Regions:
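Short beta-strand segments of immunoglobulin-like
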Residues: 20-27, 38
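Structural beta-strand segments of beta-rich domains
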Residues: 30-34, 86
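Non-cytosolic beta-sheet module surface loops
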Residues: 38-40, 92, 105
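Type I single-pass or GPI-anchored cell-surface glycoprotein architecture
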Residues: 1-16, 108, 122-151
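Core motif of extracellular immunoglobulin-like domains
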Residues: 34-36, 47-51, 101-104
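Extracellular beta-strand/loop-rich beta-sandwich domains predominantly from IgSF
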Residues: 69-97, 107-109
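N-terminal V-set
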Residues: 39-74
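Extracellular/luminal immunoglobulin-like beta-sandwich modules
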Residues: 100-124
Length: 151
């Protein structure tokens, strides 16, 4: 009985909708780019994504959300096809003080994650920053497979 209850609880947590990672970097043009990676519980309905800064909407894929005038024509949000990532591109990102940005994903549930962004501490966006962990995992796996073959 306890095993069944534990299994049900663990499966429930394993399939929960969540934001797994929120990263930020500076583009070559010195604009802010944020990637919000998420996991969904179902393929439908299509999720919406909203980025806010201090309760002001920076950008959203939800047509019901009005963009704050401060970010009009500066903030663009898009859900990246096939990789469960919502991307914010913000032009004219000032470097006066750290700012809190929140990514909110809404599908069946609403989940969010907040990150403090300080321009002077941001790294340059690159292919390595996007795919570095995947590349490292691939190389490590390849080395382990080659070692296993020779044992």
């Amino acid at each position: 009985m306890y095993i069944l209850a534990t299994a049900v609880c663990l499966l429930g947590f394993a399939s929960a909708q969540k934001v797994t990672k929120l990263t930020s970097c500076l583009t070559k043009e010195k604009n802010l780019r944020m990637d919000c990676e998420y996991e969904l519980t179902a393929a439908t309905p299509v999720p919406t994504c909203t980025y806010t800064q201090e309760n002001n909407v920076v950008g959203s894929t939800d047509p019901a959300k009005s963009q704050d005038p401060t970010f009009k024509n500066r903030g663009a949000v898009a859900i990246m096809e096939g990789i469960s990532t919502c991307r914010l591109n913000l032009t004219g990102f000032s470097d006066d003080k750290p700012k809190n940005f929140t990514c909110t994903i809404k599908q069946k549930e609403t989940v969010s994650k907040t990150s403090t962004v300080e321009k002077k501490l941001l790294l340059q966006c690159s292919a390595w920053s996007e795919h570095g962990s995947m590349l490292m995992l691939t190389v490590t796996s390849l080395v382990l497979l080659l070692e296993a073959k020779w044992l």
